[in-house]
Amino acid sequence: MFFGEFEYKLDEKGRFPLPPAIRPSLKDGLILAPGTGEKCIYAYPLCEWKKLAESLKSTTVAPSKMRRLNRALFALAFDVNLDAQGRLTLPAPLKTYAGVNIEVIVAGVNNYLEIWDKETWESEKKASQEQAWQIIETLEEH
């Protein structure tokens, strides 16, 4: 499980370290994909990515919509590994997609991580915090 918010600056090669506490969860690999509907990068441990892929196979969404979703997730995904110092290099297409400049935020989101440009994250975090109580109330009603 991933949680917390971590702030980093990209080095001259576009790398940043991931928190040491989460690195063991990523030892088998990491899949980076564009956030769906959000200007961020999803970072899934390989085992979680495989679970996501399997769950999508059994969904009852219309085939044309499923093809679009698969293209959005899988065609633009990258299989990456951390270097010996625990650093991650963001692929240029994903870096551009998410508008990542120098300052990045890594946010733990349960079974995956999200990588955001710091400025974009601040706006998203505020919106999420403002809506969280409404979502919780809806969950409590069911």
UniProtKB/Swiss-Prot annotation:
One of its GO terms (molecular function) is transcription cis-regulatory region binding. Keywords: Cytoplasm, DNA-binding, Repeat, Transcription, Transcription regulation. The keyword Repeat applies. Pfam families: MraZ (PF02381). It is found in: Cytoplasm, Nucleoid. One of its GO terms (cellular component) is cytoplasm. It comes from the Bacteria. The keyword Transmembrane helix does not apply. GO terms for biological process: negative regulation of DNA-templated transcription initiation. Residues 5-48, 77-120 form the SpoVT-AbrB domain. Belongs to the MraZ family. NCBIfam families: division/cell wall cluster transcriptional repressor MraZ. Forms oligomers. HAMAP family: MraZ. This is Transcriptional regulator MraZ. It comes from Dehalococcoides mccartyi (strain ATCC BAA-2100 / JCM 16839 / KCTC 5957 / BAV1).
